[in-house]
């Protein structure tokens, strides 16, 4: 691999893949400096092939915020009912959403559907940012989501939708699907940012921000501001779970989540690592084994290389 990445005029896609693979080898044997250099080279190769600007996410949050500040959402009595109740798990990628989905989906009444793109597509296909009547919008979102989720191949009563980026749409969920549950995952901000940077997100939709430390920091700020906004206008509406506290006592944490969801406790929930449902995220190893602790401290080994994201978090008063 070391010889391959030195070949002149090597395709950027190959540079990306070779450098990433080699960086992981170096990190595994604690050779941090060469590992980080190769990781950065892999990320640079990716950004050379992809034109990305964080401004789209910033503008998206501004539009959502303005819409909810300028409209009133009366409580609605909907004619249609959900036979399969959605459980949304939201938060930053790498905040523990996959682990919680694996645990909760081990319950006999819950089906883990993974990262569904249903809700973002519905919102994007609506005209909520063009002075849409709020009631019409709520009906549209509800009907469309109900239609899509009813087609999932399961008879279980609860469906987990683990699309992390649904944090943008908390207000839409609360008003159009009031029977839904929303679990919001927290984790140490630097642990999240470092984990986003070092993860292999090259082929993941929506993860273009994760290939530069600066855009990771800026995206985290957007996420933080978005959740702060939802908590201000809809206080105490979410099931809040701190990943670091959860892994210290996942037995009590699991029981608390199951209770908050209104489900009866089942001991098999604690055997989540035996749940052989398909997992298609970077968290595969985490959900296949017992919970491990202290992973949120790993970023400190790489701290001197993470200055750009550290400065962004500090400048926005985000503690870590």
Which functions belong to the PLM regions below?
Residues 112, 182, 238-240:
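Conserved beta-strand scaffold positions in the cores of enzyme catalytic domains, especially
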Residues 117-118, 187-192, 246-248:
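Conserved nucleotide-binding/hydrolysis micro-motifs of P-loop NTPases
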Residues 164-165, 245-249:
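Acidic, metal-coordinating catalytic cores used for nucleic-acid/nucleotide bond scission
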Residues 173-197:
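Conserved phosphate-donor/acceptor-positioning beta-strand/loop module used by diverse small-molecule
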């Amino acid at each position: 691999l070391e010889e391959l990445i030195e070949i002149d005029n090597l395709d950027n896609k190959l540079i990306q893949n070779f450098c990433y693979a080699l960086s992981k080898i170096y990190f595994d044997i604690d050779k941090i400096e060469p590992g980080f250099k190769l990781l950065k080279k892999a990320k640079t190769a990716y950004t050379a092939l992809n034109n990305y600007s964080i401004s789209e996410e910033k503008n998206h949050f501004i539009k959502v915020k303005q819409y909810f500040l300028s409209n009133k959402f009366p409580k609605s009595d909907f004619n249609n009912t959900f036979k399969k109740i959605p459980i949304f798990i939201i938060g930053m990628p790498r905040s523990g959403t996959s682990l919680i989905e694996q645990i909760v989906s081990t319950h006999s009444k819950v089906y883990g559907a993974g990262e569904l793109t249903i809700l973002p597509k519905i919102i994007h296909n609506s005209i909520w940012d063009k002075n849409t009547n709020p009631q019409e919008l709520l009906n549209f979102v509800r009907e469309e989501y109900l239609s899509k989720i009813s087609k999932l191949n399961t008879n279980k009563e609860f469906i987990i939708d683990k699309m992390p980026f649904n944090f943008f749409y908390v207000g839409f969920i609360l008003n159009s699907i009031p029977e839904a549950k929303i679990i919001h995952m927290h984790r140490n901000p630097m642990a999240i940012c470092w984990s986003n940077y070092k993860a292999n997100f090259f082929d993941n939709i929506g993860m273009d921000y994760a290939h530069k430390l600066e855009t990771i920091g800026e995206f985290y700020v957007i996420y933080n501001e978005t959740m702060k906004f939802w908590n201000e206008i809809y206080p105490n509406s979410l099931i809040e779970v701190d990943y670091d506290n959860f892994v210290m006592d996942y037995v009590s944490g699991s029981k608390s989540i199951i209770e908050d969801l209104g489900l009866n406790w089942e001991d098999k929930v604690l055997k989540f690592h035996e749940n052989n449902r398909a997992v298609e995220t970077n968290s595969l190893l985490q959900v296949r084994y017992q919970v491990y602790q202290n992973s949120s401290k790993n970023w400190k080994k790489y701290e001197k290389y993470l200055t750009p994201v550290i400065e962004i978090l500090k400048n926005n008063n985000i503690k870590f």
